[in-house]
Amino acid sequence: MKRAFKGGAPKERTVRVMTGGAIESIQRPVIIRKTPVVWGIPCDEIMYSKFFQYFIKHANYMPWDGWCFTEDTYLPKARNFIHNAFLLESTMPYLLMMDSDIVFPPDLVDRLMAHNLPIVGGWYKDKKKDSHPPVVFDFVPGDDDYLHVVPRQKGSGLERVEAMGAGNWLMTRAVAEALGESPYSLNRGGEDLEICWKLKQLGIPLHVDWDIALAHVGVGVY
């Protein structure tokens, strides 16, 4: 690090990514993030090219960050593997859960960390429903043992919510410890809803930043 920046850190860096058969060159400011994060990527059956294009352009990945992904595509198992690896085999302060079908804007980690919250994420649309509502919810009563939710309307700024998709959220080590090992489960519905319900029972606030718009590949970008 000292050798590389002996003459002072560069102000900008050039990122080159091939998109649509052409090389795209982008000038990005150099931002040194001192706080490490584990990037947890639960892989889908396929890895989307757009994910890697935007990761190279926007991630601002630091040499001291961690990286964890799985070959298993069964989502609860994959998320639990990443969660447990962060909890038991890492000492880093943050885990970023980032699905392989999520495309994200620049400086995502820095923007989420700046909130200094236990767990916070950007938002994206539901690509399975025709109306594509935000994957952000309120819990509602049901007549069985499953977790029932209704989608929220898109808001603005930072908002505390009851539930949201796990495709992009940043949690602190304290939250991971409070949830314990292997907290993801499909027993009562979506594995991310199970986490959100546990957070609610633990009194841990969950927030969405509506200003961080993500793309759910299959819906469209932003």
Where are these regions (language model features)?
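Short, high-confidence coil segments that cap the C-terminus of an alpha-helix
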Residues: T91-M92, L117, I204
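Conserved catalytic core of nucleotide-sugar-dependent glycosyltransferases
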Residues: H83, P105-L186
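N-proximal low-complexity "stem/linker" segments adjacent to membrane-targeting elements
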Residues: K2-T73, K77
